[in-house]
A protein has these predicted regions:
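N-terminal amphipathic/basic-hydrophobic helices that include classical n-h-c signal peptides
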Residues: 1-23
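Terminal low-complexity "docking" segments
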Residues: 24-131, 145-154
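Short, hydrophobic/amphipathic alpha-helical patches that form generic packing surfaces
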Residues: 135-146
Length: 154
């Protein structure tokens, strides 16, 4: 009887370890893909100080808390805009007024400026590059979905 309990305990621990490593691989993939997105934006706009500043901030954030980007992406991009993202209308995001989305944030003005820093270069891209940017967003949403679904186990 006791050996059966130990077996279940070991199996549970093993599943938790597997889940942890699986989630960390999703986080790593998300962060790498996000940086690819930023780097591709820098190819299109190599002298854009806002993108360079954003990249530096993202690198710092990833070092302090690697999973924060994917969690925030899920909560503030994927969840509220999933249907719009799947429709593929990038102009919606470029032209949207985000003031209501960040009104409850401690420093909403800062976040509105950050959104503008990110979307302004996209607004000025050729259509082909806008479509690539949208594909990055779709991929990041898919990864954040995977991370969130695995949050509670297999």
């Amino acid at each position: 009887f006791k050996s059966n309990n130990y077996f279940h305990l070991i199996l549970y621990a093993f599943k938790r370890i597997l889940l942890f490593f699986y989630k960390m691989s999703i986080v790593k993939t998300f962060n790498e893909h996000f940086m690819e997105f930023v780097n591709d934006m820098l190819v299109v706009f190599p002298r854009n100080a806002e993108i360079i500043l954003g990249k530096t901030a993202l690198i710092g954030i990833k070092k302090i808390n690697p999973s924060i980007l994917i969690r925030y992406w899920y909560d503030y991009v994927n969840t509220p805009y999933k249907n719009d993202i799947e429709k593929g209308d990038i102009e919606f995001f470029i032209n949207k007024d985000y003031s209501q989305d960040v009104k409850d944030f401690e420093d909403s003005g800062y976040f509105l400026k950050a959104i503008d820093r990110f979307r302004e270069p996209i607004r000025n891209m050729q259509q082909e590059n806008k479509e690539k940017a949208l594909q990055y967003v779709k991929n990041l949403c898919a990864l954040s979905d995977m991370y969130h679904k695995e949050k509670h186990g297999f």
